[in-house]
């Protein structure tokens, strides 16, 4: 969890270093830089997302490539389906142009389910062992048999994909990836991220499970920091259907969660204001979220 923040702190350090003479900023230079930016049009992002497999990565990413063909092919196909749920170009604008698939993905030696490169348009995702066979399994949920990934949704690739894409939209959308007082102001007065109010050694607690055990949050993991809080809200909106089905209940019972959902949807609509998204699942999900949490 803390490893992801290292990427962002590296950016912050570079910004501080570049602004040592902060009182000598040339406004004409800033205007010139702004004019160099291309217009924000959908056609600027009209290209395919690249799914990268069997390709080593450099420090600080350790990308194990020993996944089975069955697992990596299944994950890649599931990823293609996820990309197709969004308007064409959405992932490109989100700086998620390259998706690297690894087995046992590690960042600085720490295992990660996924990670975003804050400087380059890359997302790294870990392919779980046996994911292809798990997708065809049926398990008993207490009353009937259901698909393994529907019941154990934390193993569903759609969970980590939607979570990491939210991270990528956030860091592309604005600098609130570093500081976000407006978001933090939605929490209960006095709340501090990192004080989870639970024992991390208690293995009976699944920090990724969707629950409202801590008011204002959709999972224990969301209480880690504002970045993970935002990503978990995005995941509930766009993640597995089993998770999304809980959105109405969460919003009806928790005004803070409802406010976070509304803020996220508003930001996403501003991020992708272009025509042509009407028939995408992304549009359907955010429209439903507005109704459920309005």
Regions found by a protein language model. Give the residues of each.
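Sec-dependent bacterial lipoprotein signal peptides
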Residues: 1-16
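Processing junctions and N-termini across compartments
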Residues: 12, 57, 286-287
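Bacterial Sec-dependent N-terminal signal peptides
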Residues: 15-53, 289, 293
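Residue-level detector of alpha-helical secondary structure
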Residues: 31-33, 76, 80, 265, ...
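Beta-strand-rich recognition domains
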Residues: 54-64, 240-241
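Auxiliary, metal-adjacent structural segments of Zn-dependent hydrolase domains
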Residues: 59-138
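Active-site-flanking segments in enzyme catalytic domains
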Residues: 103-111, 115-117, 122-294
